[in-house]
A protein has these predicted regions:
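Surface-exposed, short loops/turns at beta-strand junctions within beta-sandwich domains
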Residues: 882-890
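Solvent-exposed serine/threonine-rich low-complexity stretches and specific carbohydrate-binding patches
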Residues: 862-873
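Aromatic sugar-binding surface patches on proteins
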Residues: 871-881
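Beta-strand/beta-sandwich contexts
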Residues: 827-856, 864, 891-893, 901-913
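Signal peptide processing junction and immediate N-terminal pro/mature segment
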Residues: 36-50
């Protein structure tokens, strides 16, 4: 049977096996954070970190375990107290990250119960939002969110990875200007660099969609670029095709309904001689039972109208560099009864018709990935890379042809790490050598003999003889590779996109530099703001761990892997509880700098099997008053002694809808009343709401009146536990419901809200009449207890908002899934750039507010403060020759940083010299 979402979800909340990147969390992350980086900010770090792993074959973890491995690194001192007793057994092979479980967690909420997303749902919601801008409200409503980073993150493996950011799916280098680089983030939009990646600025924040699947420049007219939207890596559905006619400076959505929604663009290609002829491989798994939006589509009018010429689920499409009429497409297979065979297809008539060159002869019912690359140096040399999809028995292989597809030879890939194929997957042919080919997996592998032998260029995993073992000490980049783009001017220079952002090599992969200093792409799951110090925050992110903010935009990764929810002990804020996925909870002391104890696991919560009923990112909260902790599986667990022990006050009572055909239901939201901690509300991913008035000992079902949708958040009035709000995900329903009688009845207070999934609620602690709602297109706010809503997104792009946190100083933070953390309130003297003027010769004037008398001026990521000729609180003037000012033709980024490390917005000035 085909593996649809409904069948996957039987295991979506089941723990596959804990990823070693997370199990190493305390082993390495806390050590590095507390011993190496406790006093560092990103401004004190090198602009880029160049890392070479030397001979990959020498990377080994001693049999005595990872502590010995850390001790073997020069300059590192290991304190035994920093290592938990549950540290990973390094003698075992590394197991796969649960990328599919993460994807199911994200997708199930949005598709339950129909297993589909309505066509153009996001676009309609966006248009509705535009009609309800907060500018229509009173003047005091015109507050502005500001980004507080991470820009970028001091990674747990900083000596090797450098600074990190969030997941990058696509990279394109201009064929006319090798310094012009575009990157597409998973859910963070398009970013542009004019200096080879030294600095980036976002350029698509005014568009409906920030999920990017593919980007390409036109070779015949490099002013034109296209972006295919959507994240095929279990992220977010796309809204079609964006187009730029000015080298990526600005973008417009051009595709009409002939490119059906929803879908994700896995690959986009442009005809080498005709910039109006565009091909896209659109891939979708949640467009209904028959996945009708998937297929290979062709446009001949610059991306407006589209025609599907090949049905199925394509993962890749490439154009023959010697003949633009010849195309190759790699097809996956989802629907066994209706999809074409999984395999390689060729078109000789510009994509009008297709012929199958070969099909895999095994396990066609499984979903698979399929990638294609053609050697620019010898277009008769074609490589394909295919196999299973994020699971066991991948059967990955490289199949190549030296005669343009007439005959084929298999290369088995037993010596390289192909784990997570379908998540971190690409194939690239060297522009000069037809025998050199690259495979992106968890690491980047290179072959110079047509796939006969391989070298690991990034070095996070090594072959232990019994599988690939995770040992990033000595590695060169973040794990999980998603994109590779060559520089047209230098064949030894190429860019990598991975789960940690962008890296670059200028020596053909011998070493890599991190290019993440100006990128803010982290995908946060939640946020916890220090109760008294608004400069300190904690948040869990997708594959960039749990991070601590200790300065304006400086964050440090202290818990590796996937970070979940965080709880700060209100009685002693130096004690923090951090989560990985499923049931793993860790107690950290010394303001997040020292690991103390693992206080939760699947077994802790009675889940002893490989398929525990615990959400991928389970609900985990405090009550804001004392140190009591609350954790949800399908039951509610409580700890009153800092996590040292847990109990289920209602015993084995199931607070969810139980085990059903669509999968095992689990808790997704918990809220405890501050004014009466005996009142507790819970919500489940399949829409069951429960309430207890005696501390969780007994429960009442309060689902009646709520829609059959995933409950994502619950907020209780701080002074009246009878008043509560519930947010729900999905479509074709209201998204905020309110009770005034402890759940006995519910009122739909969605009002003018667009029909878009909602994930987070916050009642303003200083004004219970004001409620904030985090949705998939940003923040909405009601100042009338939910009676009406207005878009409250000034300063924030249309990004998914997963969580809020607030403290008594009036600061509110929003955790976004793709653009880091945004803050409302905060220091009133924060600098802001209003305008920048360059006279074209020797003088640059920056105007704004809050500069102080000696601001630091950052131009294109470089400190140019020594060029200051005069400054005040409202202006800064730099004088000198153009070269000394650091300005060059094209876009330049300008930023002000005050003496107390407060930073302004990044201002872009275009210089024509």
């Amino acid at each position: 049977m085909p593996r649809r979402l409904t069948t996957k979800l039987r295991s979506s909340f089941a723990s596959r096996v804990a990823h070693p990147k997370a199990l190493l969390l305390a082993v390495c992350s806390f050590f590095i954070a507390s011993n190496c980086f406790s006093s560092l900010s990103t401004s004190a770090l090198p602009e880029t970190k160049k890392t070479s792993i030397g001979r990959p074959s020498t990377i080994r973890v001693p049999a005595t375990g990872f502590q010995s491995h850390l001790r073997s690194i020069p300059g590192l001192r290991v304190s035994p107290s920093l290592f938990p007793s549950t540290a990973v057994d390094e003698s075992r092979p590394a197991l796969e990250e649960d990328t599919e479980g993460r994807g199911d967690w994200f997708t199930f909420q949005r598709t339950y119960p129909s297993n589909s997303i309505p066509p153009d749902a996001r676009l309609r919601a966006w248009n509705s939002r535009q009609r309800n801008q907060v500018a229509n409200l009173a003047p005091q409503a015109a507050q502005t969110w500001r980004s507080v980073g991470p820009t970028a993150t001091v990674s747990a493996w900083y000596p090797f990875w450098g600074l990190t950011s969030g997941r990058v799916n696509a990279i394109a280098v201009s064929p006319a200007n090798s310094s012009l680089v575009l990157v597409g983030a998973s859910t963070g939009g398009i970013w542009r660099s004019t200096n080879g990646g030294e600095s980036f600025v976002p350029v698509s924040d005014d568009q409906v969609d920030l999920a990017v699947g593919s980007i390409a420049f036109s070779k015949s007219n490099p002013s034109i670029a296209y972006a295919g939207m959507g994240d095929t890596k279990f992220g977010y559905m796309g809204s079609g095709i964006l187009k730029s006619t000015n080298e990526g400076k600005t973008w417009l959505r051009v595709s009409n309904s002939s490119l059906p929604s929803p879908g994700t663009i896995a690959k986009l290609e442009i005809d080498s001689s005709n910039p109006d002829r565009v091909y896209v491989a659109q891939y979708s798994t949640v467009a209904g039972n028959k996945v009708t939006s998937s297929g290979l589509y062709v446009s001949t009018d610059g991306g407006i109208k589209w025609k599907r010429t090949l049905a199925g689920a394509p993962r890749d499409v490439v154009i023959d560099p010697s003949d633009s009429k010849v195309l190759y497409a790699g097809l996956s297979r989802i629907e066994k009864d209706t999809d074409p065979d999984f395999g390689l297809y060729r078109s000789s008539d510009s994509g009008d018709t297709w012929t199958n060159l070969f099909s895999a002869q095994y396990d066609l019912a499984r979903r698979r990935d399929f990638r294609v690359a053609i050697s620019p140096a010898n277009p008769r040399m074609i490589y394909t890379y295919f196999g299973g999809f994020v699971g066991s028995n991948l059967d990955a292989r490289l199949r190549f042809s030296t005669d343009a597809g007439t005959t084929w030879t298999d290369r088995f890939l037993w010596t390289i790490d192909t784990a997570q194929l379908g998540y971190n997957t690409y194939l690239a042919a060297d522009p000069q050598d037809p025998l050199t080919v690259y495979i992106g997996s968890r690491d980047l592998f290179k072959s110079t003999d047509g796939g006969g032998s391989w070298t690991n260029l990034t070095g996070n995993f090594y072959d232990s003889g019994a599988g690939f073992q995770y040992a990033p000490g000595g590695s060169a980049t973040h794990t999980d590779q998603h994109a590779l783009a060559f520089s047209p001017a230098n064949p030894n220079e190429f860019y990598l996109g991975n789960d940690g952002g962008v890296s670059k090599t200028t020596d053909n992969g011998a070493s890599f530099s991190s290019l993440n200093r100006t990128l803010t792409l982290s995908q946060f799951i939640g946020i916890a703001l220090h109760p008294t110090n608004p400069a300190i925050s904690y948040g869990g992110t997708q594959d960039n761990g749990t991070q601590i903010r200790s300065a304006d935009s400086t964050w440090q990764e202290v818990l590796t892997g996937d970070g979940g929810h965080v709880v700060i002990n209100p009685l002693d804020p130096s004690v923090v509880f951090m989560t990985y996925v499923r049931g793993d909870i860790f107690r950290v002391v010394n303001n997040g700098q020292s690991f103390e104890l693992q206080v939760g696991s699947n077994a802790t919560f009675g889940e002893f099997f490989q398929t525990p009923r615990i959400a991928f990112y389970p609900p985990f909260v405090g009550n804001g008053v004392d140190s009591t902790l609350y954790f949800g599986s399908w039951r509610l667990f409580i700890s009153t002694n800092l996590g040292n022990s847990w109990f289920a006050p209602a015993g084995s009572l199931d607070l969810t809808k139980g085990v059903r055909e669509v999968g095992s239901d689990v808790l997704s939201a918990i809220a405890v009343a501050r004014s009466n901690r005996s009142v507790i509300y819970t919500g489940s991913v399949q829409g069951r709401a429960m309430r207890s008035t005696n501390g969780g000992q007994s429960w009442v079902d309060i689902t009646a009146g709520l829609p059959d949708r995933s409950i994502t958040s619950i907020a209780i009035d701080p002074t009246n536990p009878s008043i509560a709000y519930v947010s729900v995900s999905g479509f074709n329903t209201g998204h905020v419901y309110k009770t005034t009688n402890t759940g006995a009845s519910w009122i739909d207070v969605s009002g003018s809200l667009p029909d878009i999934p909602a994930s987070a609620l916050l009642i303003d602690p200083s004004d219970p009449n004001t409620v904030y709602l985090g949705t998939d297109i940003g923040v909405f706010r009601s100042t009338t207890q939910g009676n009406d809503w207005r878009s409250f997104n000034r300063g924030m792009p249309p990004v998914v908002v997963h969580g809020f946190s607030a403290n008594g100083s009036g600061v509110i933070q929003a955790a976004t899934y793709g653009r880091g953390v945004y803050e409302l309130g905060g220091p009133s003297d924060r600098p802001s750039i209003v305008s920048v003027d360059f006279n074209g010769k020797k003088r640059l004037t920056i105007s704004g507010t809050g500069f102080g008398d000696s601001p630091k001026v950052i131009i294109n990521g470089q400190d140019r403060s020594n060029r200051l000729s005069e400054s005040s609180d409202t202006s800064a003037v730099l004088s000198g020759k153009t070269k000394k000012l650091g300005l060059k033709s094209g876009d330049n980024s300008v930023q002000i940083i005050t003496s107390d490390d407060l930073s302004s917005n990044v201002f872009t000035i275009t210089v024509i010299l």
